[in-house]
A protein has these predicted regions:
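S-adenosyl-L-methionine
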Residues: 154-200
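Conserved SAM-binding motif I beta-strand of class I
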Residues: 147-152
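Non-catalytic substrate-recognition/targeting regions of SAM-dependent transferases
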Residues: 6-20, 27-103, 110
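S-adenosylmethionine
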Residues: 182-263
Length: 300
């Protein structure tokens, strides 16, 4: 396989769908927010694996291969590898239309590596990564010197992340693999007086913890964010929150954190779009993120 055919590429998007290449396989699947016309209509003929459904998580959604591709659906459903920036990641089609990675998160990696390398000059950089899924960002941060606690409530996601670590030659990096509910674990870490320099979280709109605990972002995010902020050390880098469905503004969250700590004007927020750029230079919006950075030292 040629090296240029091993990575990720957003080829085109439009009419509610996106055309992507993961390694050697071209995939056509739904994309929320992709309602512009397609820029390269002829490119869609190259799709080999297609998710049939008007949206992700469709109850009637299913994967099919195009008749022209010559691909075998059963073989593709077993998975294949995609290389990106030194990492080898396992791609496995899910019944929800997901593939096990969120490429829009990779635009944060340069900021992670810079922040970690700057942080290491002051001491160890401990990262708590919540809702960490299959681990591409955990692996990126570990490969740049961080000690990472990778946590997800789904055992199969953590097992998948460990496979990605092995495929990437990073199984010996300082990564702790935890299957647990994010809120339960953060609260327990507070009781243990554990501290981290960086907390990263990508919560879903809805979900369930390891023991069936219900998660609803509009109900549970603020209390979790308060715990995350309290877990920061005196050498804190901050808290990074990404989501496809935030229902609260950066200003409101900052005010909640300041209220919880009893300190004002001590938190800086940076809002950034989460997006992918296609071959024509167009941006597909995929949500947004917020960085919460301490102003001055952290006092507990």
């Amino acid at each position: 396989m040629n090296s240029e055919r091993q990575g990720y590429e957003l080829i085109d998007f439009g009419e509610g769908r996106k055309l992507e290449r993961f390694g050697s396989i071209t995939v056509d699947r739904p994309a929320r927010g992709a309602w512009t016309p397609k820029a390269i209509p002829e490119a869609w003929e190259s799709a080999e694996l297609i998710y049939r459904g008007e949206r992700m998580n469709a109850s009637d959604g299913s994967w099919q291969v195009s008749s022209e591709s010559g691909r075998n659906l059963d073989e593709l459903m077993k998975g294949w590898e995609c290389k990106t920036r030194g990492l080898n990641l396992q791609i496995i089609p899910q019944r929800t239309g997901q593939l096990g990675v969120f490429p829009e998160h990779w635009s944060l990696w340069d900021w992670y590596s810079r922040s970690i390398q700057e942080g290491i000059t002051r001491g160890p950089v401990r990262v708590l990564h919540l809702f960490a899924y299959t681990g591409s960002s955990s692996l990126w941060m570990a490969s740049h010197g961080a000690m990472v606690t990778h946590l997800d409530a789904m055992k199969h996601a953590v097992d998948w992340a460990r496979v990605n670590a092995k495929l990437s030659g990073l199984e010996d990096k300082p990564i702790r693999w935890i299957v647990e509910d994010a809120r339960r674990y953060a609260a327990r870490e507070l009781k243990r007086n554990s501290l981290y320099e960086l907390v990263v979280l990508d919560p879903p709109s809805y979900g369930h913890g390891r023991n069936g605990e219900a998660w609803e972002i509009h109900r549970d995010l603020v209390s979790l964010m308060k715990d995350c902020w309290q877990l920061l050390s005196e050498n804190a880098i901050g808290v990074v929150l990404t989501s496809h469905s935030l229902n609260i503004s950066a200003k409101e969250l900052r005010m909640e954190l300041e209220l919880a700590t009893g300190k004002t004007n001590r938190i800086q927020t940076v809002v950034f779009p989460s997006f992918l750029e296609d071959c024509s230079g167009r941006r597909l919006e995929c949500g947004e993120g917020i960085r919460f950075e301490p102003v001055g030292s952290m006092d507990h």
